[in-house]
């Protein structure tokens, strides 16, 4: 099903999967729900943000399936959504950081903390593409559900991501070029 099998040794921790996606995706189809069920069945920890769209839909899925191993990441400890009243991972962000960069701090923390990624992407979301790029930079496997074509692909390196971007529409290639020009959101001092 695309997920690595890992035997959890005594004193080890469950795999952490950063699950995120586009804000304009308001429901999860059966394929995405099947993948989420697989994550839950394997006992992986789910790291999710507090935004509307895919974040809140993943929270709804976990809540309705009584899945408890969820951490909600929120800037300054104030989640916009926490449907299951799960533990909140606070990401401190100064008042001088605004807009996209404000929310990307939380995403950077989830990229850093996760072992794997699962992204539900509309092919246009800058934030989701930034997460995929950051996970690839760290050599972390990411399953990407491409909602426009209903297909799942694997990416684990910048080279694999660039091959994917090369077959995307011009709009997506331009978006990736913009992201590549920005410094990575990962910092040793975050």
Description of each model-found segment:
Residues 25-181:
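Acidic/glycine-enriched connector segments
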Residues 15-23, 49:
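Short, hydrophobic/glycine-enriched beta-strand segments
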Residues 1-14:
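Short, Lys/Arg-enriched N-terminal segments with co-localized hydrophobic residues
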């Amino acid at each position: 099903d695309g997920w690595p099998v890992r035997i959890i040794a005594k004193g080890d921790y469950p795999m952490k999967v950063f699950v995120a996606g586009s804000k304009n995706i308001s429901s999860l189809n059966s394929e995405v729900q099947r993948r989420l069920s697989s994550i839950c069945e394997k006992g992986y920890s789910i790291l999710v943000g507090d935004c509307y769209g895919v974040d809140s839909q993943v929270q709804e899925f976990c809540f309705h399936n009584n899945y408890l191993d969820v951490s909600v990441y929120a800037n300054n400890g104030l989640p916009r959504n926490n449907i299951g009243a799960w533990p909140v991972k606070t990401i401190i962000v100064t008042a001088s950081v605004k807009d996209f960069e404000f929310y990307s701090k939380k995403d950077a923390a989830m990229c850093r903390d996760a072992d794997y990624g699962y992204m539900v992407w509309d092919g246009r979301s800058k934030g989701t593409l930034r997460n995929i790029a950051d996970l690839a930079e760290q050599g972390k496997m990411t399953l990407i559900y491409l909602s426009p074509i209903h297909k799942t692909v694997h990416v684990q390196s910048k080279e694999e991501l660039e091959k994917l971007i090369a077959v995307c529409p011009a709009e997506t290639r331009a978006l990736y070029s913009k992201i590549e020009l920005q410094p990575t959101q990962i910092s040793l001092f975050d």
